[in-house]
Amino acid sequence: MEQTTEKKQGTADRERAKEKKALYFIGILGGFFFVFLGIEYIFDNRMALVTDSEGVVAAQGCILGISAAGFLAYGLLRHYLKEKTVHYLLGISGIVSVGLLLGLFGNLSWSWMLLLGVLLFFLLGVLGAAAHDICARLQQGSTALGRMAGAAYAIGILLQFSNHSVSGNEWIEAVVLAGMIFLFGGMAAGAKRMLPETRGEDTGAASDSADHSGKNSVEDRREEQKASRRKVTLMIVIVCLMTCIFSMLDNAVTMAHVSGQADIGQWPRLFLGGSGLLAGLL
């Protein structure tokens, strides 16, 4: 009887831990999507004050490109620096990002606005990579990864729509976004406490088990490595193609927004949230 009770308690604890990880995953990624898209919207509007629509699109291309560089830079930081050092750098990046965001509201020229945007989005790329890294490790092996990612994207879009529709003032929107940077950063720090303390801990255990079962021969490992490389290569190609398509469409929509033909912060933005949910279900 006691064993049955303990078993049920253990199952309940695991379910609660699983639900907690799922909430952290959605909260962290949803918060990042909200911050990134919201700041991009503000940057476009601020840049439109000092240049024409073509200049805004060109500047947007620069900041999005540099955010990708920041995304890649995070991998180098994790590879060459200690975990605690990376943790401190991420905290500093969040604080500096808030300062740069508020700096966009100064009386700036096109070149200074672009410089602030480049610095800001490089740091956002680093923070975004950290958010994705933590979430991926948090849900390693989960079969619901796609659904949770879709839900996180939809929540991020909904938050941006609500922030823009309710506040009606860019300063207020910026303050809300600044608060969200600290909030999702705090959630990321909390989520890291749920991760294994040492990298490769689970991998090492899996390798030992495979060695004992006789399935981890040299040939098996080579085949697994080849299969992994093919999967990674295919994933990179797909992501690159989708990013290229999305960025081209984004440029076209931004051109219409800056020229006054439409406000992309209003209800059409909700289509993105719906597409994210649908992609997660598929």
Feature names for model-found ranges:
Residues 141-164:
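Glycine-rich segments within core transmembrane alpha-helices of 12-TM secondary carriers
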Residues 57-78, 274-279:
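Central cavity-lining transmembrane alpha-helices of secondary-active solute carriers
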Residues 173-190:
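Symmetry-related core transmembrane helices of the 12-TM Major Facilitator Superfamily/SLC fold
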Residues 50-63, 257-275:
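Loop-to-transmembrane helix entry
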Residues 125-139:
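Intracellular juxtamembrane helix-capping segments at the cytosolic ends
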Residues 93-107:
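C-terminal ends and interior cores of transmembrane alpha-helices
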Residues 13-48, 52-56, 228-250:
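Pair of pore-lining "gating" transmembrane helices in MFS-fold secondary transporters
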Residues 111-127:
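Hydrophobic core of transmembrane alpha-helices in multi-pass small-molecule transporters
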